[in-house]
């Protein structure tokens, strides 16, 4: 049985989580924790959040029965939770709206963010434009190359995009730079972290804002079928879209839950981003979790065809769920994700993000082992517009 009251008062999920940061950030984090504790059950705050999610984001989004995909595969019925239909094209806005409302109540005038695929950067720039914040987004220079359309969207929205050229020039390096910025500007700046990683209270706060995914999906599946789904599947980078779907189902023991990491070119090659499957516990970005690191504890470079899964750590609640066995974590490699991307596009006319394609790929494998009376909810965490250049390049086409 999962304890719903996690994390504890110190931000721990079992041995994971916590607040491993420089002394200069402890006060800012305590201030944030105090504000979140105050507002998370405040009716005015929750009412404003609900209104923004409904009128601005477009929630609730549908739970779509992928009839043609299910028929093509044979086996379980596949339902897609359509986070791709949100304003800005992914689940990220569920969280940035919540944190922006918190920043407003805390009197902050500037927001910063890190981004990998660019979706969190776009979602942060979007809420900054809406609420009148100055906005700076840190993004690895490698990811800037992969996600040029999202970079342009951020700039259109009025954000400054800062290229990060250190390390692997991807998400972990962008996160490092954002933390450095925050240390220097704690008084006027709110750091909008995009995933369920980072120091306490971020893993809890982001989970709570993303849990709307699972709350809606649970009610929608009950309405459509009269029962709970047999399985849930979501991709896991930092893990916010996954925990958002999983959290409201954790105590439903009849529901199998699968998190899908980026297997890259194959786990055996070392070129992947599967920290839960191939990593070990350590400390990164302010929390204890599973990491991809060498024998000296140095964080390894990672690889995935999808920029949003290209991260060497994972949210601490996922680490806890792995150890307890409540969630089973699998890896899908680049080519399997690409195959699923094409199959969903051709059968349903839905172009998924490459991140989400990892979840679709595992759901296809899983569905084949199940009966036609059973069902799987897949979190379609984002749409694939941002990935057109990557997919075209794989196909040998320049656009």
Curated annotation (Swiss-Prot):
Its cofactor is pyridoxal 5'-phosphate. GO terms for molecular function: tryptophan synthase activity. Keywords: Amino-acid biosynthesis, Aromatic amino acid biosynthesis, Lyase, Pyridoxal phosphate, Tryptophan biosynthesis. Its EC number is 4.2.1.20. It comes from the Bacteria. The modification N6-(pyridoxal phosphate)lysine is found at residue 92. It is an enzyme of class 4 (lyase). InterPro entries: Trp_synth_b_CS, Trp_synth_beta, Trp_synth_beta/beta-like, TrpB-like_PALP, TrpB-like_PALP_sf. Pathway: Amino-acid biosynthesis; L-tryptophan biosynthesis; L-tryptophan from chorismate: step 5/5. The keyword Lyase applies. It catalyses: (1S,2R)-1-C-(indol-3-yl)glycerol 3-phosphate + L-serine = D-glyceraldehyde 3-phosphate + L-tryptophan + H2O. The keyword RNA-binding does not apply. One of its GO terms (cellular component) is cytoplasm. Belongs to the TrpB family. Tetramer of two alpha and two beta chains. The beta subunit is responsible for the synthesis of L-tryptophan from indole and L-serine. This is Tryptophan synthase beta chain. It comes from Legionella pneumophila subsp. pneumophila (strain Philadelphia 1 / ATCC 33152 / DSM 7513). The lineage of its organism: Bacteria, Pseudomonadati, Pseudomonadota, Gammaproteobacteria, Legionellales.
